[in-house]
Amino acid sequence: MRAVIQRVKKASVKVNGELISQISQGLLIFLGISKKDKEEDIKILADKIADLRIFSDENGKMNLSIKEVNGDILVVSQFTLFADCRRGKRPDFTDAADKEKALDYYKKFVAYLKNKSEKVEEGIFQAYMEVELINDGPVTIILDTEDLKKPRRRKE
């Protein structure tokens, strides 16, 4: 699983011009699911995001998690996070999970996050969405469960 996480002042999703969901201060998460992903990846990624200290404390240091600031979360499915652009001019999406697996894991990821955080909103799976956001910072973090499962590198 791969997530592009953006700290936002606010974000919203529209489909066909209709407002589907919106959040105030919090995290906008673009979520991609690959063929290789396992059920355990849902918990690994959701736990990491819920505890990630990327909000500023009273000293301006990134030291607080989404839970500690009572922030909102907006999750948007995005299979294009698994685009392979190594050859040719058109991205190849064969590493992305098929729609049945992707929908299942997406729903489970959102449900798991809802157990960790007060307010979790979502886009519409497989819909063409207009996503609006106001970045806060900007702070953008990319997480991939393939990397999260590897041992930590030693500092040199």
From Swiss-Prot:
CDD domains: Dtyr_deacylase
Presence of keyword tRNA-binding: yes
Xref: InterPro entries: Daa-tRNA_deacyls_DTD, DTD-like_sf
GO cellular component assignments: cytoplasm
GO MF, one annotated term: D-tyrosyl-tRNA(Tyr) deacylase activity
Superkingdom of the source species: Bacteria
Motif Gly-cisPro motif, important for rejection of L-amino acids per record, residues: 137-138
Protein localization: Cytoplasm
Enzyme nomenclature, EC number: 3.1.1.96
Keywords tagged on the record: Cytoplasm, Hydrolase, RNA-binding, tRNA-binding
Known catalytic reactions: glycyl-tRNA(Ala) + H2O = tRNA(Ala) + glycine + H(+); a D-aminoacyl-tRNA + H2O = a tRNA + a D-alpha-amino acid + H(+)
Keyword match Hydrolase: yes
Annotated domain remarks: A Gly-cisPro motif from one monomer fits into the active site of the other monomer to allow specific chiral rejection of L-amino acids.
Assembly information from the UniProt record: Homodimer.
Family note: Belongs to the DTD family.
Function: An aminoacyl-tRNA editing enzyme that deacylates mischarged D-aminoacyl-tRNAs. Also deacylates mischarged glycyl-tRNA(Ala), protecting cells against glycine mischarging by AlaRS. Acts via tRNA-based rather than protein-based catalysis; rejects L-amino acids rather than detecting D-amino acids in the active site. By recycling D-aminoacyl-tRNA to D-amino acids and free tRNA molecules, this enzyme counteracts the toxicity associated with the formation of D-aminoacyl-tRNA entities in vivo and helps enforce protein L-homochirality.
Protein name per its UniProtKB record: D-aminoacyl-tRNA deacylase
Native source organism of the sequence: Dictyoglomus turgidum (strain DSM 6724 / Z-1310)
Lineage of the organism: Bacteria, Pseudomonadati, Dictyoglomota, Dictyoglomia, Dictyoglomales
